[in-house]
C-alpha cells in the first residue's frame, strides 16, 4: 500500500456536531469520490464513550464500516470508559495503541 493513498483520522471529541458536520461527511465523501484509497479512523478518548452510548452515532459508524472505511479504537480508552464490549460488538477493532 502506498502511504500517500492512506488517510488516518484521530477522532478524540465527543461533540456530535463535529462528527456529523466534519468527520463523517468528509470520510464518506472521500471514500465515495476516491480521494483516498484507504481511510482509517482511530477512536481515542471521549469519542469511545459517545460511540458506545449514542445510537445515531452508531448508525453513522455502521455506514462508514459498510462503505469500506476501517475503524479502530484505543483499548485502554475503551476500558477506562467501560465500553470495550459495546465498541467491539459494533465491528470496531479494539487494540492497545
Predicted regions and their residues:
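Short, glycine-rich nucleotide/cofactor-binding loops
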Residues: 8-21, 46-52
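Histidine-anchored nucleotide/phosphate-binding helix
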Residues: 20-33
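Short, glycine-/small-residue-enriched flexible loop/hinge segments at domain edges that mediate gating
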Residues: 33-51
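C-terminal structural segments of small proteins and small subunits
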Residues: 86-97
Amino acid at each position: 500500500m502506498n502511504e500517500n493513498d492512506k488517510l488516518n483520522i484521530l477522532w478524540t471529541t465527543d461533540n456530535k456536531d463535529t462528527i456529523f458536520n466534519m468527520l463523517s461527511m468528509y470520510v464518506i465523501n472521500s471514500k465515495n469520490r476516491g480521494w483516498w484509497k484507504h481511510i482509517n479512523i482511530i477512536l481515542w478518548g471521549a469519542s469511545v464513550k459517545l460511540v458506545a452510548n449514542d445510537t445515531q452515532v452508531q448508525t453513522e459508524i455502521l455506514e462508514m464500516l459498510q462503505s469500506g472505511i476501517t475503524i479502530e479504537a484505543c483499548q485502554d480508552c475503551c476500558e477506562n470508559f467501560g465500553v470495550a464490549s459495546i465498541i467491539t460488538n459494533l465491528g470496531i477493532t479494539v487494540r492497545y495503541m
